[in-house]
A protein has these predicted regions:
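A short acidic, Gly/Pro-enriched loop at the edge of an enzyme's catalytic core
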Residues: 86-97
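C-terminal alpha-helical "lid/dimerization" subdomain adjacent to the S-adenosyl-L-methionine
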Residues: 2-8, 128-180, 184-186
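A short SAM/SAH-binding and catalytic strip from SAM-dependent methyltransferases
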Residues: 97-109
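Conserved class I S-adenosyl-L-methionine
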Residues: 1-26, 39, 43, 142-148
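Class I SAM-dependent methyltransferase SAM/SAH-binding core
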Residues: 29-87
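Short glycine-centered segments of the SAM/dcSAM-binding site in methyltransferase folds
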Residues: 29, 124-126
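A short glycine-rich, Lys/Arg-flanked "PGG" loop and its adjoining helix->strand segment in the class I
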Residues: 111-123
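C-terminal lobe and adjacent flexible extensions of AdoMet/dcAdoMet transferase-like proteins
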Residues: 187-193
Length: 193
């Protein structure tokens, strides 16, 4: 709350919007990158038993925590793979949905990450998620610059809501984007060609 200046309702609102790109009763292939500790998504994946979910993270420690959560929930449809979002080890068009919660502000090579996510998404597929954008909340911007960057949690440069919308519109056929304080959420659909 101190950093993001959000109450629980605001936090829940941006997460709900970010996850709204995953269709109800989804039964396709989903890539989550980065999975982090899985705290936000493992309970959701319990409701998607017919889907094929791959969770990728650069950090073996974070991924291990997510895998423990999946094991506790007896998730049989979720697999884990260590890797780099800038060089995804998947074929072109391998996924129906790519989900990225709170990741892009940390990725060191954001251009490669955007390119790779687009590459592994099938035509007509959905890219959805959320991450920090600068210029929406002064207090958050200060913490990011003076605390999180030094701890290695965030890596500049950062998008603004405007630059993110423009970037996504260059790649995707449809883009829905909003902000809640310093967080942007988005749902994009890749064109059919």
């Amino acid at each position: 709350r101190l950093v993001w200046a959000m109450n629980k309702a605001e936090n829940d609102a941006y997460l709900e919007k970010a996850l709204s790109g995953i269709p109800e009763h989804f039964s396709g292939k989903l890539l989550e990158v980065p999975v982090g500790t899985g705290i936000l998504t493992m309970p959701l994946y319990k409701t998607l038993p017919k889907s094929d979910i791959t969770c990728l993270d650069y950090s073996a420690d974070m991924m291990g925590q997510a895998q423990e959560k999946a094991d506790r929930l007896h998730l049989k449809n979720v697999t884990f793979q260590q890797g780099d979002v800038g060089a995804l080890p998947f074929t072109d068009g391998a996924f129906d949905v790519v989900l990225s919660l709170n990741g892009f502000h940390a990725f060191p090579d954001k251009e490669a990450a955007y390119r790779e996510v687009f590459r592994v998404l099938r035509p007509g597929g959905i890219f959805c998620g959320c991450f920090y954008v600068k210029g929406e909340q002064k207090r958050t911007d200060w913490f990011v610059r003076h605390v999180y960057e030094g701890m290695g949690f965030f890596t500049p440069p950062y998008e603004t809501a405007f630059s993110l919308k423009k970037r996504l519109e260059k790649r995707y056929a449809t883009v829905t984007l909003g902000t809640v304080k310093g967080m942007a959420w988005f749902v994009c659909r890749k064109g059919l060609r």
